[in-house]
Design a protein with these regions (language model features):
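Membrane-proximal interfacial segments on either side of biological membranes
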Residues: 1-289
């Protein structure tokens, strides 16, 4: 059954034959998912090779690819410049799918099914800064504001493993499970470690974009692996140390204001009036994270 995956707007285009390089050439200015971009395609019929260049300043992405279409399984090389970082990928195009992988396949690999559209990718990083993700002009914020994820036909699963959080020495072993389905962006079942002492598990996580406000909301479960060592890190007096096993809480994080709000906090499955009063007072202060 035919279906519309996306609508591409073309504002200006030129198609001509390059007599110097013996190539059919297309140059066009376009917009897709509210993201403007420039596209250049060169077809070398003699060598059966297509060169493609994609550039979008809004999402800070440059892509160059060379594809040989002589074989049944078409192979090529993809060079990406994303947030000032270069990535080279090999890819294979079959009838209804595309497989891609970096030279070190453990670093990046994935597949794309064309119909219906589905993207799955696995990425491994040695380190990343949360500032790159959550600052106001970060690529994540720009992508959400572009509404590129609002298409009901985009289905994506990303598994991202990050060894270290470079701007927080205590945080490590971040696993992000990002799903995009029918316009919803979820981070459910993601997790991160605080040293070796706490595991922070995101049971539910959802990005909400409404009237230029971006919020991240969900439910956290914090499991104590070595609570004594955690207390020692903050030099907490032994008289105030509680032998707790687990903390649960709902949260809302406003990415525009960098403010957290918490609710429904439980310690070892038990709520407390004193704790509720403390959380309410914290929420009312409007402290910036």
């Amino acid at each position: 059954e035919d279906e519309v995956l996306f609508i591409n707007k073309i504002f200006d285009s030129k198609f001509f034959y390059d007599q110097t390089n013996l190539q059919n050439t297309l140059v066009s200015k376009n917009e897709i998912f509210n993201v403007p971009y420039k596209l250049t395609v060169k077809n070398d019929k003699f060598n059966k090779n297509i060169f493609t260049k994609f550039n979008s300043k809004k999402i800070r992405l440059d892509i160059e690819s060379n594809t040989n279409y002589d074989d049944i399984v078409k192979k090529g090389l993809l060079d990406l410049l994303f947030i000032n970082k270069n990535i080279s990928l090999d890819y294979e195009i079959k009838k209804n799918s595309l497989n891609f992988y970096s030279k070190d396949k453990k670093k990046l690999n994935g597949l794309i099914d064309f119909k219906p559209f589905y993207l799955e990718a696995n990425l491994n990083y040695d380190g990343i800064s949360t500032k790159e993700l959550f600052k106001r002009n970060s690529i994540l914020i720009d992508l959400i504001k572009s509404e590129i994820f609002n298409s009901q036909n985009l289905n994506t699963n990303l598994n991202i493993n990050i060894k270290d959080i470079t701007n927080f020495s205590e945080l490590n072993s971040l696993y992000l499970k990002i799903s995009l389905e029918q316009g919803n962006i979820t981070f459910s079942d993601s997790k991160i470690m605080w040293k070796e002492d706490l595991q922070i598990f995101l049971k539910d996580g959802l990005i909400v974009y409404d009237k230029d406000e971006i919020s991240f909301l969900g439910r956290l479960i914090i499991d104590a692996k070595n609570i004594d060592n955690f207390y020692r890190s903050f030099q907490i007096n032994k008289n105030y140390r509680k032998d707790l096993k687990q903390i649960e809480m709902d949260f809302v994080y406003n990415l525009n204001t960098n403010k957290f709000m918490f609710d429904n906090v439980k310690i070892d499955k038990t709520s407390s009036k004193k704790l509720d009063i403390f959380i309410n007072n914290y929420n009312n202060t409007g402290k910036i994270f």
